[in-house]
Amino acid sequence: MHARAEFCTVIGHIWGWRKRLRVVHGERCPRDMPCVFAQNHVFLLDPFVSFGAAMQSAGILPRFMSRDDFFAEKKQSWWYRLVNVDELICQLGTLEISRGNVSIGQLRPFVNVLRNGESFIMYPGRTRSRSGLIFEYRGEVQEPGSASFFLAQAQRGRETDLDVAIVPLTRTRNVATGIDTVLVGHPLRLAPRAGREEQRALDFQLVEAIAQNVTVNATQLAAGILYLHALHGLEESIGRGGFEAMARAALERVNGRCIDPDARADLPGQVSAALRHFRKAGLVALSRDSIRLDRAKILATPPMDGTFRKLNPVKYSLNQVLHFADVTQAIEDVVLTPRAQCAGGAEQLP
């Protein structure tokens, strides 16, 4: 265990957890009971971020659930040949399952992890998002994976009840700054001897909790402003001052959400970082005083694969908060009002 902790600390330095990972509400992470950490699946290397959040929050060294063919398509990559990633994740405590042929025998080790007082990390099956949306169900999958199954099995057949919980984790990547925010949700529990309907209800409660804990950042707001200008055929050239004023007005209208502290502390700097990032993708052209958008490129929908984020970071960033009606309404309010459509932008916005 100590060797694994030291190894994970080294990995944390490589991935820059101290500088690039922000954990919110880490105090909610249970320290004295086993739990299942369930997180939205964003990138291939999500487990390292989830692990870092658990370590920072409570000093927990959770294991991982990973399918046995996770890196099958990457084995010819230079980085895979340089570092045997399968061996690397085993050092971190990975337990593998076969996605196409899951058996009780493969699931039993995860139940034993909980019964032994340890924890593990999992991601709802077949929901990895490539477009920025919180979940993308693919194939014939129509419901979230059953995290509650492991709680029910860990409690089953015991003389005394086992206190075990599911902890929702929500990862939000600010694509412009590279900062990851992981918000720890309130632990969810399953009543002992709960039936299948109660388990199913808990699984839906889990995905709702994950979805509600996305962090709102300046890059998403900037993306929304640009997208609405493109979608509604508004002016293609926007004043820098007016653009920043719209972003600030939208931010002030958002209440009851986790807000990126960098957006509050330095909104001009965060908006500028977002615009520079969008420029790299060819979506905007920047001058000292104005922003000129490329309407066709902003409205284009890239392939639903790993290139989506790079080809259209405007859509990707906006998709992160698309399920927040209050956030999208705030952006619409500041862009689609008569004063917001005036030449020069939104300097007069309240």
Give the role of each language-model region.
Residues 296-345:
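Short, amphipathic alpha-helical interaction segments positioned at domain boundaries
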Residues 1-7:
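Helix-enriched interaction subdomains in cytosolic or periplasmic regions
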Residues 212-238:
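Positively charged, polyanion-binding regions of nucleic-acid-associated proteins
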Residues 199-215:
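Short, structured interface segments
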Residues 8-197, 201, 246-249, 257-265, ...:
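Soluble catalytic domains of membrane acyltransferases
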Residues 205, 209, 224-225, 246, ...:
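Charge-rich, solvent-exposed alpha-helical interaction surfaces
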Residues 25, 106-110, 206, 210, ...:
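Generic hydrophobic alpha-helical segments
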Residues 231-246, 250-252:
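Short capping segments at the starts of secondary-structure elements
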